[in-house]
Design a protein with these regions (language model features):
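Acidic-basic catalytic patches of nuclease active cores, encompassing PD-(D/E)XK
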Residues: 1-31, 38-43, 78
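Conserved catalytic cores of phosphodiester-cleaving nucleases, focusing on short active-site segments
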Residues: 35-37, 44-56, 74
Length: 138
């Protein structure tokens, strides 16, 4: 699954959820966040870093860790505008994120995980979803 497929699937998902004002997205080799979008009714932005499916065994783990590092390095502080952050990942990488990303960190950083399957269906996970998944594993 290519990064462009993940990105376009998430853009379609967000537009159905009333995110779409001032939509900006970069090409594969552009610098900056992959998707930046404003909520249609509120002064809130989503900044999302997307990754595609890798080939090797460890590539899903690498995609998660790399995207997390990229989105953290782009986080904005201060100001009155509220920013939400997201990791846009193929399903396999998203499952790793659900296990490995501490829900407390996701809550503090307003960080969400977007999981994209082979058909382009997207599921959004909040810190509450991470907490449930991690509590269930105990």
């Amino acid at each position: 699954m290519k990064e462009e497929f993940v990105k376009s699937s998430i853009i379609k998902y967000l537009s159905r959820k009333e995110w779409g004002t001032n939509l900006q997205f970069g090409a594969l080799h552009d610098r900056g966040v992959d998707i930046k979008v404003r909520h249609n009714r509120y002064a809130r932005y989503f900044l999302i870093e997307c990754k595609g499916q890798g080939i090797g065994r460890g590539s899903n783990e690498v995609a998660f860790v790399y995207s997390l590092g990229q989105v953290i390095s782009r986080m904005k502080t201060g100001g009155t505008t509220r920013y939400y952050y997201g990791l846009g990942l193929p399903e396999k990488s998203a499952k790793i994120a659900l296990r490995r990303l501490p829900w407390q960190v996701a809550k503090k950083l307003l960080l969400y995980v977007f999981s994209c399957d082979e058909k382009g269906n997207v599921r959004q996970y909040s810190w509450q979803d991470l907490k449930k998944a991690q509590d269930f594993k105990k």
